Every structure is written in C-alpha cells, then in structure tokens.
Amino acid sequence: MTTPAVTQRDSTADADGGAVPVLGLRANWRQFWLLVLVNAFVGAMVGLERTVLPLIAEREFGLASKSAALSFIATFGVVKALTNFLAGRLGDRFGRKRVLVAGWLVGVPVPLLVIWAPSWSWIVFANVLLGVNQGLAWSTTVIMKIDLVGSKQRGLAMGLNEFAGYLAVAISAYATGEIASRVGLRPEPFYLGVAFAVLGLALSQLLVRDTMTHVRHEAASAAPDGRRAARTPRARELFALVSWRDPALFSASQAGLVNNLNDGLAWGLFPLFFAAAGLSLREIGLLAFIYPATWGVAQIWTGGLSDRLGRKWLIAAGMALQGLALVAMVAVRGVAPWLLTGALLGVGTAMVYPTLLAAIGDVAHPSWRGTAVGIYRLWRDLGYAVGALAAGLLADAFGMAAAIAAIGVVTVASGLFVAVRMPETLPAR
C-alpha cells in the first residue's frame, strides 16, 4: 500500500473527500507527544510511593512483617492487572479517550487518601484506586500510541512512551525522598500527587483526541496472515491465545510477569534493604531514583533498536542482565556499588519493557490489538503482586538478601525460556 501524502496535521483526503488517517509518528506528532506528556503524569503518580510508602508502613504503622508491609503493592498489582484487561477491551468497544479520562478520575483521590490515612487499610484502599488509575490510563496511552504510529515505528513509540513514564517515576520518587528528608514522610511529599492528577485529567479531557479512526484505517488495510487473523476472536479465545497458545505471546507474557516481579521487589524491598544497611532517606531516595531513571532514559534507544535488530534476543538478554544485577546487588555494599547495580538493572529492564509491547503489537491484528495488549499487561502487572508476596515471604523466612538473590535467579531462567521458546516477531522488511 502506498502511504498517502500528508496534507493535514494527521490525515489526508481520500477520493471521496473524506478524511483518511495517516499512520506514523511524524504525521501524528502533536497527539503523540501530548500522550507522552500525559503518560509522564501517569508514571509520576506511582513514583510518589516508591521511596516513602514502605518506610511509612514500618515507621508510622508499625508493620514489622515484610509481607504485611508489602501488601499495598500486592493489592496494587492485582487490581492493575485486572484493569489492564478491561482497559483494552473497553477501549476497543467504546473508544480510547473515554477510558483514559475515566482512569484519571479514579486517580484524583489517591494522594488525598494517603495524606489523610489514619490506618494502613486506607493506604491499601488508595492503592486499589491507584491500580485502577494506572491500568486504565497507562494501558490506554500505550494503545493509542500504537494506533498512531503503525508497524514501522512501533518499538520506537513504545520506547518513548515508557521513557516518559518511568523517568517520571524516577523523578517523582527522588522528589518525594528529598521532601521527606526535610519535612517528614507525610503529608508534604504527596501534595505533588494532587497536582499530577489534576494536570493529567485536564490534558486528557481537553486536548487528547481519540485514535479509533486510525485503528479502523489500519484494520481495513492490514493483510491477514497465519497469526494476524482478520476475524476478531472472542474474549476467551484471545485470553488463551495470549496466555499460552501462541508461543510468541506466551513468551512475552511470562517475561512481562517476571520483569514486574522484579519491579515489585524493587519498589517494596529495596527501601527497607537500604534502610537496614544504615542509609539516610536522601540516599535511599537517590537509589530509588537510579533504577527507574536508567530504565526510562535507556528506552529511548532500546525501543528503536528492536525495530532494527528484532525483539527476541533483546528480550532474552535484558532478562538475563536484570537477574545478574539483582544477584550482584546483594554481593556488594555501599552507595556507589548499589548505584551501579541499580543502573544495570535499569538497562536490562529497558531492553525488555518496550520490546515486549512492540512484540505484542507485531502479532496482534489491529481489530483485537487493544484486547491483546490488555491481556499481556494483565499477566505482566500480576508480577507486582507475585513479586511483593514472594519477596515478603522470602524476606521473612530467609532475609532480604536471600529474597533479592532468589528472584534474580528466576529472572535469568525467564530469559532462557525466551531464548528457547519465543520466535522472532519483527515483521520482515
């Protein structure tokens, strides 16, 4: 198919004078970068908690058990995982923008609940709402960018999306750590969250446009092949396809789950691990910053790199690097070595994160892509719950260092599975 010339901002005229969407980052750059900004605010919402909330659990609510202290992450992960699936399905049925705005409406009360919480149950409930917010809003910004750019720049688009989200996670985590070191764990660090939620909601409602016309255009022009069936499967068929039947989608789903198992570990256990080593709040904030910051920045290159080199081996190598970084983290001591291992963990995650999303987009037909992304993200974000529970139970039984090392070994095994089982998904040029 010949790409039509761009005569409008993001569409051109067809033979009948109607508007035909043009796929590509350049043709849709205004909406694309607006969605990047929106996703930065989504990421900043979860970054609020990464430095201070595990410490609030211990110091303000007296939760000595690591599994109890990490319960908020498990709750967040389960809710976000289920909401991811709903977001994809609802977006395919009712349009992307409505789902995005709904996600922000649910997110507005989150920082207020944390500020006012008289008991730990309030924190857990706030993370139920945060899981819904992240599942609806982050999933939808991912799907909308895939809609806009088409197949040729899918990896780059996912890299830029995740760059914005996780750099914002890092900056928010560092900022809350700095504020907490000066004035306390609550309420001041969470005032930032009120601003993030209001700005994200305003941009989504007032400036973001829906992308369903791009979806219909791509679906009409997509040539079906063995894996990209033009018939839209039922939800049950799609769930089985993504979860275990298709080797590429299954490989991506298990790697995504283990990847976020690591992130759940880092979110919940790293601040406690570093605090037990005698580090200050400012140093803990710096270490909470370096992992998602490296992850976020490196995705600018790794997403586009997968468009050139392919998906499979970047995913396998990234999982192996993450696992080795976790094992190394418990073998060293001191802020500088931990900064290095945190950066290596971030690079490994950056190799994997946007590439997995791009691989899902490679395999899924445009007509059911949103649902496929939602199912993949369901499995991926269940990793938060699995990671929090596994890390907490292992830490209570064997110590925090043993928990971190054990999850590192699991991560290397996941990378080996990808190397053996996953076919290359990048379309032939």
Range-by-range predicted roles:
Residues 98-112, 313-328:
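Structural signature of the two symmetry-related core transmembrane helices
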Residues 27-55, 245-265:
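Pair of pore-lining "gating" transmembrane helices in MFS-fold secondary transporters
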Residues 83-95, 180, 298-310, 395:
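Helix-to-loop junctions at the C-terminal end of transmembrane segments
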Residues 52-66, 268-283:
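Short amphipathic helix-loop junctions that connect adjacent transmembrane helices
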Residues 128-166, 358-359:
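Cytoplasmic helix-loop-helix junction between adjacent transmembrane helices
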Residues 10-29, 210-252:
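Juxtamembrane intracellular "pre-TM" segments in multi-pass secondary transporters
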Residues 77-85, 170, 292-300, 384-385:
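Residue-level signature of mid-helix packing/kink "hotspots" within the transmembrane helices
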Residues 188-205, 404-419:
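Symmetry-related core transmembrane helices of the 12-TM Major Facilitator Superfamily/SLC fold
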